[in-house]
Amino acid sequence: SHDFASRLIEEYAPLFRSRSFNIGGDETFDLGRGRSVQDSPGASRDELYADFVKDLCSTLAHRGLQPMLWADIALENPHTMDLLPGDITMLNWMYEPDIDESKIQTIASQGRRQFVCPAVRAWSRFFPDYDGAWLNTYRMAVAGLKYGAEGMVVTDWGDYGHVNDPRLSVPGLCYGAQNAWNPVAIDACEMNHRISNLAYGDESGWLMDSLARIDSDGVSFPWDLAVQVLELEYGSGTGMLNTDVASYVERSCGGELMFDRALGCADARRRLLLRNHARLERRRDCDRALIDCGSAVVAVLDGSARGGLNPELLWVMLDGQRLFNRLGEELLVLAGGEDACGTKDVTGRALDASRRARLAADLELWFERYRVQWLSIGRYAELARIAHVVWSFADILRRGAL
């Protein structure tokens, strides 16, 4: 892997003017397992990590490049940080609204260079969490200034296929620009009014208020939960439980042991859906919020595209969330939560199957609209992964079984 990474550095470094090169190094979940153990018996995880990073830094040094490294693994253990070269710029990322300031202090106390790295909080969402993004960027900037960080990197990324459209990240980038330049306590509402005017030409200042409500008020079945439900199956059509995904979901739920490994995928999906039944039951209220917010934004846009936002993109993403809200409700019915959900028709299962089939078709048609938006600004990349999620759920709906 070192030889491969070094070849990538040799190929990519000449393409950029910058003398700084980010070697990554974050979230090394499999370190100390498999081949890394076989190749270095007796080495600790700290030593395995530090040795690999030092080798990459040596490759960069031969080209006169300055290494940058995501700081999360080094911060897990002070010994790891001690083993790393002193000339690395640490990229200290924290993406939650409530940050852990001590992580910034730890790097500063070692005299190391660091950038603070907040996020626009768009991953695994049809619309970003704008409220959380504002708090995250503001608090990271304030803490970075306090402990002498040399700069800030605002991150925008996606999980599970990157369903989030980068054009919707413009407000988050504006938050980052404001806070990197001058992190003063500005009310979030005031900042949103400024962005409404500056980025979207809305002199009333209210467009961002409607956009910011979408993620908080309009989501009953979020993209990440949908993908977790889907990926609980090991392979396609096997009915077997993916124990790695099951363990990840349990860790995400505070370590609660939710799944019986002996009962397979369908039982695990049922348990996960029923655990989230209160959220899934909010579908009707969420859909009303989506329609209200979308109508308000479209009225301001008045048929034009501003700041990368256009009415068609807006409705494609809103309709995607509305369809996934309906999907969550139908999956809850299949999980046995129909009484709580109130969607099972008194005429029986045949009409339920008809309703599910219509939703399956609506999801497939929606994806074609989404595909047009995706390809209007980029190449195929991860689009096939999103297609797999949509088409797999369409199959489940038509089959009528988890």
Predicted regions and their residues:
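Surface-exposed loop and adjacent secondary-structure segments within mature catalytic domains
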Residues: G32-R33
